[in-house]
Amino acid sequence: MSKKCALTGRKPRRGYSYAIRGISKKKKGIGLKVTGRTKRRFFPNMMTKRLWSTEENRFLKLKISAAALRLVDKLGLDQVVARAKSKGF
């Protein structure tokens, strides 16, 4: 199953997970040192939702991110779907 948002196009990003040791300077230590880093992925907060479309007069079952859900609350589903279609998501 795809981990890409149907409305915003958000997808997993790549980054690093850092292994840290030492005592922080705030606690009067010498500071934190990075002893290693491993590759990891940051996933968007995805969920499957059934949303009512007034334009199509039916429910749409979409796999969307939490950010897209806030966008739907703000602008309305039909406007967000139109924007996604124009951008090609």
From Swiss-Prot:
PANTHER family recorded: 39S RIBOSOMAL PROTEIN L28, MITOCHONDRIAL, LARGE RIBOSOMAL SUBUNIT PROTEIN BL28M
Disulfide bonds: none
Protein name: Large ribosomal subunit protein bL28
Biological processes annotated in GO: translation
Swiss-Prot/TrEMBL keywords: Ribonucleoprotein, Ribosomal protein
UniProt similarity note: Belongs to the bacterial ribosomal protein bL28 family.
Pfam family, one: Ribosomal_L28
GO cellular component: ribonucleoprotein complex; ribosome
UniProt GO molecular function: structural constituent of ribosome
